[in-house]
Amino acid sequence: VTAVADLFAGTSRVGHALKSRGYRVLSNDHNAYAHTLATCYVQADHEVHAADAERHLAELRLLPPAAGYFTRTFCQEARFFQPENGARVDAIRAEIARRAAAGELGDDPARAAELEAILLVSLMEAADRVDSTTGVQMAYLKAWAPRAARDLELRLPALLPAAPDGKSRALGLEAVEAARQAADEVDLAYLDPPYNQHKYLGNYHIWETLVRNDEPEAYGVARKRIDCRERKSPFNSKGGIAPALAEVIEAALSGERLRYLLVSFSDEGFLDRATIEAMLSPHGEVEVISRDHPRYVGARIGIHNPAGERVGTVGKLRNKELLFLLRRK
């Protein structure tokens, strides 16, 4: 195996880890924040961008604060960040957009897009280090987190060199479309789809807004983007997830090159072990590995009302991740 596809890339930790081990990676996610992370951590190569990125970051660090949409929405209407840091985010985001539009990130469009992604990821991660949350953006803490008092600090993301097998790529497609591309490009596809009603967009809605820079209508205490409410995915419904996952599996197996599928799913998900095994077993030998994990952070904290008070009780604190490895016939 020299090339791997990650079809639900999310934060790109898997794709970054694979690239660090020398694999050529095809990383896909339809959310803009996730595609930006993949462009930075999977597609962009250290030897191409590190020096230019550090030069731009050094200049961006010197910008004076300039409060705008981000400050108003996430620091005043909500309390995710201190206003001083919010105003710096606004200023830096506006300058990245200006440089991109003015062609100051390079003459080659593909390389300029990679450099823009690196700068945006640096800003996302800088803001993440000074937020007042438990790690996801469904809610902010009732009392300020100590780290929220720190100053925003831009750092160069951990870029990696190109893989020996060739350039890695980031896609921003629906999973089934990316699977069709992967079928003849990679040896193994990794599928880690949403497994219940919780949308990743809602967990990271601030990063989606920061990357898109579209100043959307916001709602609720957390000031989520309106499309968190409007965008629907079959993977987030009991009735839709089985046919949606089956379609992605069939698409990934539609080509000649791909020999292995690795599917990750939680025992808290809408599908049980037997259902997933039944999807995979007609195509070859299936091995199932079970691993014990702490539950996601929101489940461990419990449910809170709009006033920030806990309601109800927390259930079990651990769950099982099931890994289904298909070796194709």
What are these regions, as identified by a protein language model?
Residues C75-Y204, E215-R231:
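SAM-dependent nucleic-acid methyltransferase catalytic core
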Residues K232-E287:
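Conserved Class I SAM-dependent methyltransferase catalytic core
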Residues V1-T2, G22, E116, D184-V186, ...:
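A general structural motif
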Residues A3-A78, A87, A91-A97, A117-L120, ...:
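SAM cofactor-binding core of SAM-dependent methyltransferases
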Residues L26, R169-L171, E287-I289:
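General small-molecule cofactor/ligand-binding pocket signal
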Residues D272-K329:
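C-terminal catalytic and target-recognition region of SAM-dependent MTase-like enzymes
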